[in-house]
């Protein structure tokens, strides 16, 4: 069986029309960029971005921070290359293929003043452990800022399945309560909840958009529906309005200035 991370990376490798369909990701990137601009980062901050994709977040934050050393990383070599093509002429940015859940850096790379991620950490297999690893790469006083998806995301698609006695292949996103309860080395985060709704022309358009942004990877235990069953689900989805919710949670974790954490 192909490992989940390999399937996810492969999905993003094939997401050639990502920019045309990732509307929600773009909106949240703009919001994250405004929050980054408001942080007291100081001169020449070192920034690590996890899951850079095609560069939405860096583009939204461009020009707002002076003297930045911004390391853009992604698990997908194709996405890293697209970001490199977009920003490669700038001395501000560097690029690397990295599994954000298991980051491996030379000692000279860390610590970072800011670690950020837009719509990336929900792919982690163990979210709290993965975030804790990132948190430990921060300097004292540094910030971990990220957006992720919560329970309720694509609820309309799941409801269309459940109404017919089927199970959708969408991942089981954590509840808001589970996310807010996470402590990284004992540190509590500041969380904000938001819900964005996208309406599609039809069910095929919705599924095409998911594949285009690399989000069509089903959960590992999902058994695909027959063609006839899928047509029933698509019809039900369209009858309900062909809308899909994105339940977005944005978090800010500050590493204490006090003695180094374990």
What residues fall within each predicted segment?
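Conserved alpha-helix/loop element of class I SAM-dependent methyltransferases that forms part
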Residues: 23-43
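A short glycine-rich, Lys/Arg-flanked "PGG" loop and its adjoining helix->strand segment in the class I
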Residues: 128-140
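A short SAM/SAH-binding and catalytic strip from SAM-dependent methyltransferases
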Residues: 113-126
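Conserved catalytic/acceptor-binding region of the Class I
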Residues: 141-203, 216-226
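A short acidic, Gly/Pro-enriched loop at the edge of an enzyme's catalytic core
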Residues: 104-115
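Class I SAM-dependent methyltransferase SAM/SAH-binding core
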Residues: 46-104
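Conserved Class I S-adenosyl-L-methionine
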Residues: 24, 54-56, 190-262
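N-terminal, positively charged/glycine-rich alpha-helical extensions of SAM-dependent methyltransferases
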Residues: 1-16
């Amino acid at each position: 069986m192909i490992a989940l991370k390999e399937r996810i990376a492969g999905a993003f490798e094939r997401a050639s029309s990502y920019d045309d369909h990732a509307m929600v990701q773009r909106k949240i990137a703009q919001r994250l960029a405004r929050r980054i601009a408001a942080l007291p980062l100081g001169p020449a901050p070192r920034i690590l971005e996890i899951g850079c994709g095609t560069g939405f977040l860096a583009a939204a934050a461009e020009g707002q921070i002076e003297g930045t050393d911004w390391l853009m990383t992604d698990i997908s070599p194709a996405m890293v290359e697209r970001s490199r093509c977009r920003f490669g002429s700038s001395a501000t940015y560097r690029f690397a293929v990295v599994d954000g859940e298991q980051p491996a850096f030379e000692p000279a790379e860390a610590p970072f003043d800011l670690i950020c991620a837009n719509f990336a950490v929900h792919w982690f297999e163990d979210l709290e452990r993965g975030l804790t690893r990132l948190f430990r790469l921060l300097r004292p006083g540094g910030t971990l800022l990220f957006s992720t998806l919560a329970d309720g995301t694509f609820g309309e698609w799941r409801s269309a399945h459940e109404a017919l006695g089927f199970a959708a292949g969408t991942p089981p996103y954590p509840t808001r309560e589970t996310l807010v309860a996470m402590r990284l080395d004992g540190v509590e985060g500041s969380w904000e909840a938001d819900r964005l709704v996208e309406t599609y022309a039809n069910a095929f358009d919705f599924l095409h958009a998911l594949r285009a942004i690399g989000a069509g990877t089903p959960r590992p235990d999902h058994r695909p529906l027959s063609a006839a069953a899928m047509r029933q689900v698509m019809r039900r989805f369209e009858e309900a309005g062909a809308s899909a919710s994105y339940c977005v949670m944005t978090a800010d974790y500050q590493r204490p200035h006090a003695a180094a954490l374990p």
